[in-house]
Amino acid sequence: MAAPTASTPAYAILRDRLRLAILDGSWPPGTHRTLGALALEHQVSISPVREALLSLEGEGLVEIRQHRGAIVPLLDAKLFADLYDLRGALQSLLARRAAERVTPAQLDGIAAHAAAFEAAAKHDDAAAALRHNESFHAAIDGVAANPQAQAVVAARTAFVNAVRLRLGYGPARMLAAARQHETILEALRARDPEAAAEAAFAHVESARRDLLERFAEEQGRKPRP
């Protein structure tokens, strides 16, 4: 998640704060907050609160209720599995389209992001790896030139990244992801749409399995009521 700047819209700053509150449990699942209460708490007007909640609703983090503000649904394994189902379908589509139209210059850019991710993985730098992973996939998605699919993926990337930062990676997961990036890159270089789609889907499935394992471990460590 990029640090806010002077030009960052108020709703985006608030959205990031609320996302963090949801993920760290300070806005607990099953509880609702009104627009007015959120505006007062964060010293902003109603308008950025409404925009922030709409953005978080698009990520699946809140449900907006008429006259009740927003409620945080239960963050469970099914939610994460569903998100990765969506990512797998869309990122395989985008990789297929990218393989059909990628240029040598674009390949160089994608390769640079893959190399940066691998370097971060070798240093076990999860935060840097996440940034470079996002850049790698965004570069591929941009080549695919399907703004509708890109928008859906992008709307959920910040949530998935925030969850990943909280849960961490399993042993050798980042290095495995680096190898998977190289497989995707090889398919793009070969201009092989099917191979690119298959490699992208396998990459998402591998990430899904690792994140669900980390989530199960975290749930197992929580004290029982």
Give residue spans per PLM region.
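Short alpha-helical transmembrane interface motifs in multi-pass membrane proteins
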Residues: 76-77, 163-167
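Conserved amphipathic alpha-helical segments that form helical-bundle/coiled-coil interaction surfaces
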Residues: 83, 104-165, 179-187, 195-206
